[in-house]
Amino acid sequence: MEQKEMIDLLRQVASGTMDVEQAALKLKEEPFEDLGFAKIDHHRAMRQGVAEVIYGEGKTPEQIFRIAEAMKEKGQKAVLITRMNKESAIYVGERLELQYDEASRIGFIGEAPIKDGDGKIVVATGGTSDIPVAEEAARTAETLGNEVVRLYDVGVAGVHRLLGHLDELMEARVIIAVAGMEGALASVIGGLVDCPVIAV
């Protein structure tokens, strides 16, 4: 159950369109489901505002499918799967309607959330080889309802490439700087902006 659904449920009780016993039954649903190999936290969205995400690394295709299926059955509108390999994507995609991006290894099932309108997240890379990690961050942020601006190959070896995007950097509410070969990108960005900078 998501927080919005819980608020709607309580409003129904307050308005008299649902009785207290019906509401109690809905709220009593197990907060987690034990599949033997995984315990799915169905109430995470209600507590934290964001539903549980499936970390695909190390899980079998069948395990990923069963977790995603259980989430959908309990009413989770969007299921995000990170670090999903192609074999798992094929397996899950044959059983559920899956969108898969091979570069970022992100799988997505369900309805994309409406953008929250709370500003933009900038994802910047030092070089082209950093793009897969950056895309994982960008697609995850988008799946969680954020607007994302991508600034790729803007490393400090050619600082003019970064400075050419100063307006976008200044408008960001948070910046994710992905730079595997050079550690300076996050520091340089941090010296230019007043928002949080996450270094990867």
Protein language model features and the residues they cover:
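Long amphipathic alpha-helical segments
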Residues: M1-N85, I90, E94
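Short glycine-rich or small-residue beta-strand-to-loop segments that form or flank ligand, phosphate
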Residues: V53-I54, K120-G126, I175-A177
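Short glycine/serine/threonine-rich phosphate/pyrophosphate-binding segments
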Residues: E62-I64, D130-E135, V159-H160, A179-V188
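Short, structured coil segments at secondary-structure junctions
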Residues: E94-L96, L192-V193
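Glycine-rich oxoanion-binding loops at beta->alpha junctions
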Residues: I106-G110, E147-E171
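Glycine-rich phosphate/diphosphate-binding loop of Rossmann-like nucleotide-binding domains
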Residues: D118-H160
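Glycine-rich phosphate-binding loop
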Residues: G164-V200
